Amino acid sequence: MKFDYVIGNPPYNANMYIDFIQMAYYHSKKASSYIVPAKWLNLTTFSDKTWWLLKYIRKVVYYRNTIDVFNIGEPDGIVYYLMTKEAGDTYELKGKDSLDKKYEFDWVTYPTGKVGEFWLCNNRLRGIFEKLKNFPSYKDYLLSDNHFLARDYYVNNQNLLHTNRGTDDVPIAVSVANTDNIKYIARKDMYHYDYIDKYKVTSSAMEILTHNFSDFNVGALDKGVGFYGSASMLGAFDSAIERDNCYDYLRSHFVQIITSLCIASSVMTADLFRLLPMLDFRYHWDFCSDDYLDDKGVTHKSLNRYLGLTNEEVTYIQNLGYGCSRY
């Protein structure tokens, strides 16, 4: 059975999404088209085995305001793209914005890119990410040891948890952000128990997928405190100062905007952090004009100066509404 048109709703899973458009390409006669959140046209979605598909994406229309297409809030906007049966090394991009015409632009030709590069439809952010990619990535920090990966810090068995503390037991936070709810486990029964003696920043794996790094969903744990369940460790430090600075950084508006442009699969992936600059957390980082020492003796570093961002770029990032249609 063959159809002239197929209307589908691809699942929000990166691998299944690729399967969906790959099969559509095979079955289409001349072309296929898609309306998806802009981040689904991200090159990080495509592996070296599926990158060839991008050569068939020839035209892209980017709607900065999602309300131009759907009555929803999507932080990275919406794209309509056309996939033909003829491959090419370039694609054409057009920008639409009903609320602010200065963000509209006519057809511009761009190279398709290489595996691992970032496909970005928002031209205002292109220059910013050209600067960010020159800095160490938080993703590489997460991958430096396997204990930073999701589900790798689970205890062997939840049945080993108990409410009364023994001689060599370790307290376990039942919630990554609620250290008042504590159970105990013998140190020998834990995975990566050596990192129990670090100051840690943790987050729920599900909240990582939704880019929801809020006060409630990110935990700052002390030495000697572990955690279990669907949690991931985003940092482990020798000092509480480094932990606190990392904790504040991951909850910042800047981090929420940068990570919202990346796709996370159904299992927490470090790719979510690939565009996020890794910083020296001996210092606290702010969008400020100069480095300064506050009344508590904390050194505040200028994030925008370190990254080489202009005042206009800083203002643009600060004004971006995370999760709203004016993005």
Q: Which role does the model predict for each range below?
A:
Residues N9, H27, Y249, S302-Y306, ...:
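Generic, well-ordered alpha-helical scaffold segments in large soluble proteins
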Residues L41-N42, T210-N212, C324:
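Flexible loop/turn segments at secondary-structure boundaries
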Residues P37, E86, N319:
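Surface loops and adjacent helix of pleckstrin homology
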Residues M1:
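S-adenosyl-L-methionine
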Residues E312-Y327:
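Short, amphipathic C-terminal "tail helix"
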Residues I67-G229, G235-N311, T315:
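C-terminal substrate-recognition regions of SAM-dependent nucleic acid methyltransferases
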Residues I35-V36, L234-A236:
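Conserved beta-strand segments of the P-loop GTPase G domain that flank and frequently precede/overlap
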Residues D4-M83, C246:
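Conserved Class I SAM-dependent methyltransferase catalytic core
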